[in-house]
Design a protein with these regions (language model features):
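Phosphate-binding/switch loop-helix module in NTP-utilizing enzymes
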Residues: 1-36
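Short acidic, S/G/P-rich loop/turn micro-motifs used as interaction or catalytic elements
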Residues: 13-19, 52-53, 92-93
Length: 193
């Protein structure tokens, strides 16, 4: 079975439709998505960021930092058109040490939580899936449960091995570059003398 998926990344970057403001343009694109879904059976994915105000001090005080429908930037009505709204949350970004049973201090910026914010088909609202995020290659993997110590240790070991490879690679690169520059300098001075 073939599936056709259209992904728009992101709604705020859409070029304005003639005579429309940003919010109206995003809303119109969302309506196009409904048509594509209903008439052509396409899967329409509209990526939409949270408003900057959502990360403000007041929301931090109230602990309202997770993505929400009412926190969407530029056009909040797109959630009415969606079968499912999913949010990605980084507790590390807000300095949390623990979240949903996971030690954020160990994962640092390598953990995200995918939460179903709205679901009109299956009733999965509020379901959370912890994800390992490897930003170097832009991939996500589902994490083991927080009480599965062995599986989590394998993830920690993987992160440690990636960190040492990255450091070694960067270090090797710098040494090679310095050697080449030193070699050029020696040749230049030999020629100049």
């Amino acid at each position: 079975e073939e599936r056709r998926i259209i992904i728009i990344d992101n709604a705020s970057n859409l070029s304005l439709e003639s005579g429309l403001k940003k919010m109206e343009t995003i809303d119109k694109m969302s309506k196009y998505g409904i048509t594509l879904r209903n008439q052509l059976k396409f899967i329409f994915v509209l990526i939409q960021h949270q408003a900057q105000a959502q990360e403000g001090i007041e929301n931090q005080k109230l602990n309202k930092l997770k993505p929400s429908s009412d926190g969407l930037a530029d056009c909040k009505t797109t959630t009415r058109d969606a079968n499912m709204v999913i949010g990605l949350y980084s507790p590390f970004k807000y300095g949390l040490r623990e979240y949903e049973g996971y030690d954020i201090t160990k994962f640092r910026n390598h953990i995200r939580f995918m939460e179903v914010i709205e679901d009109r088909d299956y009733g999965a609202n509020g379901q959370i899936c912890p994800l390992f995020f490897d930003g170097a290659v832009s991939t996500f993997y589902e994490l083991p449960r927080p009480d599965d110590r062995e599986a989590l240790q394998r993830v920690y070991n993987y992160m440690e091995s990636r960190k040492s490879k990255t450091a070694k690679t960067f270090f090797s690169y710098r040494i090679n570059k310095m050697n080449k520059e030193l070699h050029r300098w020696k040749i230049f001075h030999k020629f100049a003398a």
